[in-house]
Structures are given as structure tokens and as C-alpha cells.
């Protein structure tokens, strides 16, 4: 239901059951390697999904049709060898994901140590209350373009939406749609290295708007085409490139601490972030000395560069797999 065709491999020493919307595929180990079958089925998720039956929104997998699916089955030793190679790639991908999570946590820890913890007992000497907008050169609106080439809409791009930002933060841009926009519009809104894309519309009752992602020469390579962003996002262009990670981490810090819920307006279905109040009206304690921001950038940039390189390696391994 909702996820027809998705496959996972259960390899845990725990007692567990599944509900009626999940099918267990139990392999005859004399004929096939279970891990090999798992990879085969995962590769064919779309095919499995096409066997689903029922009304729109309440479709279920046809177990009978699943049984009828044909599979090219090499000799058992060859199956095991193939599964071992694929499993090794998966383990490497998982390791890189966990490494990135650790690196991101390290960057956030440094941010807290430099800019949050010093203010717990009041405003330190050499600090002042200023808005995040003091660090921003300009804010640009996005464009959704067209689904197909039409008239002047000829430039093929990947368009980042708010929902894609979560993928970009955690892993890779897997579902970023392809759109077509005008050349003039592309030139005016194409993100540059050091820019930040901020989600301003979306959210739910339990998840606020306000997710963000920085743009770099590394994560730009993760996309098939040049990138733009939708009109449900805003591009923040820092006055200096060394403000990028400071702004990104500050926005993320506010987001994970649920500060953006109080800045939302709109209907119950679609929430809009009052980003102008966030960036220009609210004041936060910040150091006056710009050398502090430059030093912070030098400390965390190596972490983010490693994160981006890991993402590129993950993408390469996934294509290989």
C-alpha cells in the first residue's frame, strides 16, 4: 500500500512478523541464493509494481503474478559470487552514508561551540544582535519552467524543489525533475557556488518548512543537467563565500530546533515560511569580527568538501551496482 514493489532483505536475529500488506519471499536454498534473489527483485521494482491490483490509492501486490515472474538463474556458486560483489558495494555505500552523517554532526557541533554556546550567559564582549540578512547580498525567486520544450523554453535543467532538499542533505538528488526554462531566466537564477537554496513553501503539521542546502562545485556534479530551483524556494546569495556554511548551519540549527513553525502562515494544507521576517526582522547574537567567520569557514569547509566527495562516490557506486 503506497510502496508496492519495494524490496528489502531481512537478515536480523530477532523475532518479527509482517502485516497483511507485505509479502515474504522465502527462497529454496538448494536452488537459489536469497541475497542474489533480493538484488534481482530490487532491480525489478518497477516491474513488480506493475503487477499491483486494486483501485488507485489502494493497490496491492498480486502474489500469483509475482510467482509467475521469470528469472535468469545462473549456477548457485555464480549467484553467490554476484551477490557478494553487490553486497560489498552496498556496504561501502552504507559506510559512506554513515561517514557523512558523522561529518555533518561534527560541523554542527563546531557551529554550536563557536556561535551558540558562547551566548548562553548573555551577549559576549565583541558580539551584537543582528539579522541573518546582514550576511546576504541578494535573494532570488525560482522558476518552475515547462515540462517539455516550448517556444523560448529550451534550456534543459534539473529543478530543485523543497522535497528534493531532504534528499540532497541526506544523500543524492534521486527525484529532482527535469524542466525547460528560458535562457534569460536561467542566466538570472542559476545557483552559484556558495549560494543557499531555502524551502519557503510546503511542510506538514509535524514538519515545518525551511529546509536548506548549500551549492558547491562538488554537489553540482551530482546532477545530470544544470540546476535551477522552483518558485517554492528562494536562493540566498551570501555577501562573501565564507559566510555560506555559517548561514547554512544557522538555518539548519533553527530548523532542527523547530523555530520555523512560529514563522509559518497559510492554509492547513500548504505552509508558507515568512522568510523575510526570518532573515531581516529577527535578531541573533553574532560576533562583530569578520575574521571569526573566515576562520570558522576554514575549519568546516574541509568537512563539507569530504561530504560532497563522498556523495559523488556514492553516486558512482550506485551506478556501478
Predicted regions and their residues:
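Sequence-specific dsDNA recognition surfaces
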Residues: 6, 18-19, 133-149, 163-206, ...
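Compact nucleic-acid interaction/catalytic patches
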Residues: 7, 209, 223-224
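Short beta-strand-to-turn element immediately C-terminal to the catalytic PLP-Schiff-base lysine
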Residues: 10-11, 215-216
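Basic, amphipathic alpha-helical recognition segments used for DNA target recognition
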Residues: 12-15, 23-77, 131-139, 153, ...
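Glycosyltransferase-associated regions of secretory-pathway enzymes
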Residues: 84, 191, 210, 215, ...
Amino acid at each position: 500500500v503506497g510502496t508496492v514493489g519495494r524490496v528489502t532483505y531481512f537478515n536480523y536475529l530477532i523475532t518479527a512478523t509482517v502485516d497483511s500488506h507485505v509479502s515474504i519471499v522465502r527462497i529454496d536454498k538448494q536452488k537459489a541464493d536469497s541475497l542474489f534473489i533480493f538484488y534481482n527483485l530490487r532491480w525489478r521494482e518497477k516491474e513488480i509494481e506493475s503487477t499491483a491490483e486494486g483501485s488507485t490509492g489502494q493497490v496491492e501486490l498480486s502474489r500469483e503474478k509475482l510467482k509467475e515472474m521469470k528469472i535468469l538463474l545462473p549456477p548457485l556458486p555464480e549467484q553467490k559470487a554476484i551477490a557478494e560483489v553487490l553486497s560489498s558495494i552496498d556496504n561501502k555505500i552504507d559506510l559512506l552514508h554513515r561517514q557523512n552523517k558523522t561529518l555533518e554532526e561534527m560541523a554542527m557541533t563546531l557551529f554550536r561551540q563557536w556561535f551558540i554556546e558562547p551566548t548562553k550567559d548573555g551577549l559576549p564582549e565583541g558580539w551584537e544582535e543582528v539579522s541573518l540578512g546582514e550576511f546576504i547580498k541578494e535573494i532570488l525567486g525560482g522558476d518552475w519552467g515547462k515540462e517539455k520544450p516550448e517556444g523560448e523554453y529550451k534550456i534543459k535543467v534539473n529543478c530543485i524543489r523543497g522535497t528534493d532538499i531532504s534528499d540532497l542533505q541526506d544523500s543524492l538528488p534521486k527525484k529532482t525533475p527535469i524542466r525547460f526554462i528560458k535562457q534569460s531566466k536561467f542566466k538570472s537564477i542559476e545557483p552559484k557556488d556558495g549560494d543557499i537554496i531555502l524551502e519557503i513553501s510546503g511542510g506538514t503539521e509535524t514538519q515545518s518548512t525551511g529546509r536548506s542546502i548549500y551549492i558547491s562545485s562538488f554537489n553540482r556534479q551530482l546532477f545530470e543537467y544544470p540546476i535551477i530551483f522552483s518558485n517554492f524556494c528562494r536562493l540566498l546569495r551570501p555577501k562573501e563565500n565564507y559566510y555560506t556554511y555559517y548561514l547554512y548551519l544557522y538555518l539548519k540549527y533553527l530548523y532542527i530546533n523547530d523555530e520555523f513553525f512560529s514563522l509559518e502562515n497559510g492554509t492547513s494544507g500548504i505552509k508558507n515560511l515568512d522568510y523575510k521576517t526570518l532573515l531581516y526582522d529577527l535578531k541573533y547574537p553574532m560576533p562583530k569580527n569578520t575574521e571569526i567567520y573566515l576562520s570558522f569557514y576554514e575549519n568546516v569547509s574541509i568537512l563539507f568538501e569530504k561530504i560532497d566527495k563522498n556523495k559523488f562516490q556514492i553516486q558512482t557506486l550506485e551506478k556501478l551496482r
